[in-house]
A protein has these predicted regions:
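A generic structural signal for short hydrophobic patches within well-formed alpha-helices
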Residues: 9, 45, 122-123
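Active-site neighborhoods of divalent-metal-dependent phosphate/nucleic-acid chemistry enzymes
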Residues: 75-115
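Short, well-structured N-terminal submotif of metal-dependent ribonuclease cores
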Residues: 1-40, 55-61, 132-136
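Acidic, PIN/NYN-like endoribonuclease modules and their adjacent C-terminal/linker elements
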Residues: 104-136
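Active-site-proximal, substrate-binding regions of enzyme catalytic domains
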Residues: 53-56, 60-71
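Amphipathic alpha-helical segments within well-ordered protein domains
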Residues: 10, 49-53, 88
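Short, conserved alpha-helical segments within structured domains
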Residues: 41-44, 83
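Acidic active-site catalytic centers that drive phospho-/nucleotidyl reactions
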Residues: 5, 47, 100, 119
């Protein structure tokens, strides 16, 4: 198994640098037939989604579709596929950022009763408590 860094995954997905994209494809080619041979860890997923949204201006629906494609590709493995899949489902059905969905899902999986936040979109997620600051 090998791990992909964010910039390698971005090159693979966007092909905005043909030489780098080709280099990534060449490195991954021997692993195409090997199930779960390329790790996409949670940090890489979050950084990738942030970059695609902010820098490349991907729409939310395109990001959701991309996450679903990554999950269905047999070559890729994840820190916890079930947690990532649940986070993708939350992302698809809410206004929260993927990172917030992943935080909430992972915290619940790790036994947290709830996750507290000041983020309104995240606060609407299951097992998330929206805090309100009281004025002095």
């Amino acid at each position: 198994m090998i791990g992909l860094d964010t910039n390698a995954l971005i090159r693979l997905l966007t092909e905005d640098d043909a030489a780098q994209a080709a280099s990534v494809r060449k490195r991954l080619a021997p692993l195409d037939a090997v199930a779960e041979s390329v790790l996409l860890n949670n940090v890489v997923l979050v950084e990738t989604l942030w970059t695609l949204r902010r820098i490349y201006r991907f729409e939310r629906a395109a990001l959701r579709d991309l996450l679903e494609q990554l999950l269905s590709a047999r070559t890729f493995c994840f820190e916890d596929r079930t947690t990532v899949a649940q986070a993708v489902a939350l992302f698809a059905s809410s206004a929260a950022d993927f990172s917030d969905c992943l935080i909430a899902t992972q915290n619940a999986r790790l036994g947290c009763d709830c996750t507290v936040t000041f983020d309104k979109a995240m606060g609407a997620l299951p097992q998330v408590e929206l805090l309100r600051a009281k004025s002095a």
